[in-house]
């Protein structure tokens, strides 16, 4: 599988949100604004404690895209992250402090049905379990009821 330019995908996603090509809600627009502002802050504000690691983001996105769908019409095919998914993964894993500690340790992502949230959550969970370098990492998933699980 060829390497994609995830940072370029993130920037195009931001542009699409800002110009209205992608219909976005208030919080999605604010997340884009924060991301773009923080990219500028890392360059201009010496008190800003975070930097964006394209290498780290690429590592996580590549890890997820090397996983395969396990059932349905896409079974045995690689995951391909949608631009919004690259934006989410990039924000969660790309920002770090000078010690390499992630800026964000919690994320709340609201996604409607049939839009790839289970596959994204599985990819992030697997990465956190075995790719993040945390000793004794554990990943839990929960659901509101048995059918949802």
Spans of model-derived segments:
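Phosphate/NTP-binding elements of NTP-utilizing enzymes
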Residues: 2-149
């Amino acid at each position: 599988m060829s390497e994609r330019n995830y940072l370029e995908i993130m920037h195009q996603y931001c542009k699409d949100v800002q110009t209205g090509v992608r219909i976005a809600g208030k919080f999605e627009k604010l997340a884009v604004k924060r991301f773009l502002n923080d990219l500028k802050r890392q360059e201009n504000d010496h008190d800003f404690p975070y930097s964006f690691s394209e290498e780290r983001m690429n590592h996580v996105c590549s890890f997820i895209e090397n996983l395969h769908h396990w059932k349905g019409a896409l079974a045995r095919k690689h995951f391909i992250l949608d631009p919004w998914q690259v934006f989410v993964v990039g924000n969660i894993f790309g920002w770090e402090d000078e010690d390499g500690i992630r800026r964000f340790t919690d994320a709340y992502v609201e996604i409607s049905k049939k839009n790839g949230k289970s596959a994204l959550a599985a990819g992030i969970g697997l990465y956190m379990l075995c790719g993040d370098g945390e000793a004794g990492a554990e990943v839990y998933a929960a659901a509101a009821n048995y059918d949802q699980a």
